[in-house]
Amino acid sequence: KSISESRNKKSLFAEFNKNVNGNFDIRFASRYEKIGSSSSFDPKISFKYSLNDSLVFRASAGSSFAAPSMAQLFASEILLGTIRGADFSDKARVIQIGNPNLKPATANNSNIGMIWKLHSNSKLTLDYWTIDYKNRIELENGSVKASLEADSQDIIRNDEGYIVGVHTSFFNEEQSKVNGIDTSFETYYDFKELGSLRYKIQGTSFLDYLTPDKDTGSMVNRVGYYNYNAHMHSIPKYKINSFLTWEKMQTKVNLITRYISGYKNKTPITSSHAALGYTDKVDDSMMVDIGVEQYFQANAYNMVLGINAINIFDKKAPRLYNAPDFSFDPNVHDARGRLINLSIQLNF
């Protein structure tokens, strides 16, 4: 159906920065935002203390505000897919509609960390962070809704009892608590006529991702699970990316690795599917990309030619038992295999 809606947005931002005694920085920032009938004032304070030339400590705390988008409020969309019912799986239409009663999402954020300069060309960072959400906006999962609310009027069945449609919408999750650790290491070497080498590795570890259980209301840690029975995606505990770049003159070579840790799948597995090799675990994933860029200059033009091989070893996405699809987790992994990209960039 056609929808005609509008709203006004106003915002005001201020920031104050002060250096104390040469080695201590304090910054205060604030933002006032009014979107439609909702408004919020969100302050943030951050500190940075240089213990010496090598070691820096940092911390921050603040709040944030996110109004629902116009699509989340009013849009409608029909998708065709597979639905896991309470006892069987069906092809069905998923009717996704907006929710005009959504509240803005708010959060309190904080972090504490350090920067350690090992020497002039290398540094290590480590940060612990936490986010406490209120009214975080989520989209109902059609399969989860059909399984947990089999008798709901939003589950449309034909005369034979098979699911032919599911109405889903956006909703405010009352509370979510997320915390984790980010770390990175980077270094740089100049080999003169042999070129330069830059290496960086960065990782994230989720410690907790707590959301309410639909039945009991108690907070459940979703880290390390496929979360088939919740209106949310999988949360692998670790994600680690590394970047190695060699550069000489007009040539650059990049080598990238992307690691995602495995996670458990509590979806009940039938004995027949277990016999086919399906398990209650989604395996780790490691993908490797490589790319080469060559720079050219012709008159007043600069040109960059590039070739990139994504997932150069053609690794398959880890197998997931998710009847009726029996394939992979599209929210985490890419099943397209090896991709070759050619690019031309012209600057003038």
Task: Go through each PLM region and give its residues.
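C-terminal beta-signal and adjacent terminal beta-strands/loops
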Residues: L207-D208, R258-S271, V292-F348
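Outer-membrane beta-barrel signature, preferentially recognizing the C-terminal barrel domain
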Residues: S64-D127, I131-D132, N158-I181, E186-D190, ...
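Surface-exposed extracellular loop regions of Gram-negative outer-membrane beta-barrel proteins
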Residues: S2-K48, A107, I256-R258
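Residue-level signature of outer-membrane beta-barrel architecture
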Residues: A14-K18, F47-S50, S63, W116-L118, ...
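Hydrophobic, lipid-facing positions within transmembrane beta-strands of outer-membrane proteins
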Residues: K10-F16, F41-F47, G98, N108-M114, ...
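Transmembrane beta-strands of outer-membrane beta-barrel pores
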Residues: S30-G36, A61-A67, S76, S110, ...
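Outer-membrane beta-barrel transmembrane domain signature of Gram-negative proteins
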Residues: K1-R27, D215-N241
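Repeated loop/turn-to-beta-strand initiation elements of outer-membrane beta-barrel proteins
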Residues: N23-I26, D53-F57, S120-L124, K192-L197, ...
